[in-house]
Amino acid sequence: MNTQTITLAQLATACQNAAYINVHLYTPAMSSLSTFKPDQIRFLSASTGVPLLRFQSKTSTIVLQALSIQAAVTPSTPGNEIPFGRCTYSYTTYDFALDGVNYSVNIFQKT
């Protein structure tokens, strides 16, 4: 795991292969695993109401909605793939803090 500053320009996770993707969001208060249509993905900052994470359906990318935040990134690599039925999913984990809350976001993609 490495730590880096993520900007809007830097963080764009392609998801061309799946009409639905799973986003696993952890916070101290809750954890949720849901399947969203791409245009339904939207997590808001509790204090500002600014979207933290959204899906750009026109460009099929996921972007973190912050100009610059510190995030520890565990990229998708061979070995962190999950078989599910006939498909295999890879995932990338982004750990970051915003508004004093720690978040861990796992973005699953069909490979």
Locations of regions flagged by a protein language model:
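Long, hydrophobic N-terminal alpha-helical segment
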Residues: 1-33
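N-terminal glycine/threonine-rich, aromatic-flanked beta-hairpin/loop signature
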Residues: 23, 30-57
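Short beta-strand segments that buttress and anchor functional surface loops
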Residues: 25, 55-57, 93-97
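Glycine-centered tight beta-turn/hairpin loop motif at sheet-sheet or coil-to-beta transitions
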Residues: 29, 57-61, 98-102
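Structured surface patches comprising rigid loops and adjacent beta-strands/short helices at the edges
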Residues: 41-44, 60-80, 110
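Low-complexity, intrinsically disordered Gly/Pro/Thr-rich segments
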Residues: 80-96
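Edge beta-strand at a domain terminus
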Residues: 95-111
